[in-house]
Amino acid sequence: MSDKATDIANLLAPTVVSLGLELLGVEYLPAPGGATLRLYIDVPLAEQPERIINVDDCERVSREVSAQMDVEDPISGNYTLEVSSPGVDRPLFNLEQFGRHLGESAKVTLKLPQDNRRRLQGRIEAIDEAAGAITFIVDKAEVVVSADNIDKARIMPDWVALGLAPSKPTGPAPKRPKPKTNSSSNEPAAKKPRAE
């Protein structure tokens, strides 16, 4: 998260917690016509999977946070507030969240290049809280990334395990029949009689 997003997350987290929910993270996206402030919320880990985020939860958080933002006013100018569930391709904002998803695959964008790359995709292998680092397995090799160097990270859902993968046809593709032609020579086709 950016410094601005971190400050806003720290400001709003107690409000979200008071509603019995968890603030996973904040995205602050400035733009010339007005910024977008996106909050990702979820139910506390202890209540999952029996309870999931629903539209009513998002609306409650939106109302409470809007009122708080009007009073605290941490963003100058116009902005749009969006409150969202994390979805199956959930964003990851901190070491604790990476730790919850050990063994799963993630897409990561780095702030600064590491080994000549800013993007990586790999399995989350280990978390080192003392060093503030995450170990990924990328192309069968270990890659250790400082959490401070992560700009964005998202889980890459296993669509097959979720039962949502598109089905692949088995065997060879069926052959399409060739269009039939009435004449095998260069003679023009007979004209159809007109009904009069």
From Swiss-Prot:
Gene Ontology CC: one annotated term: cytosol
Keyword Cytoplasm: yes
Disulphide bridges, residue numbers: none
Biological process (GO), any one: ribosomal small subunit assembly
Cellular localization per UniProt: Cytoplasm
Broad class of the protein's primary localization: cytoplasm
Keywords of the record: Cytoplasm, Ribosome biogenesis
Ranges where the record places region Disordered: 163-196
InterPro entries per record: Ribosome_maturation_RimP, RimP_C, RimP_C_sf, RimP_N, RimP_N_sf
Taxonomy, superkingdom: Bacteria
Protein role: Required for maturation of 30S ribosomal subunits.
Database matches in NCBIfam families: PRK00092.2-3
HAMAP family found in the cross-reference section: RimP
Membership in a protein family: Belongs to the RimP family.
Entry protein name: Ribosome maturation factor RimP
Native source species: Stenotrophomonas maltophilia (strain R551-3)
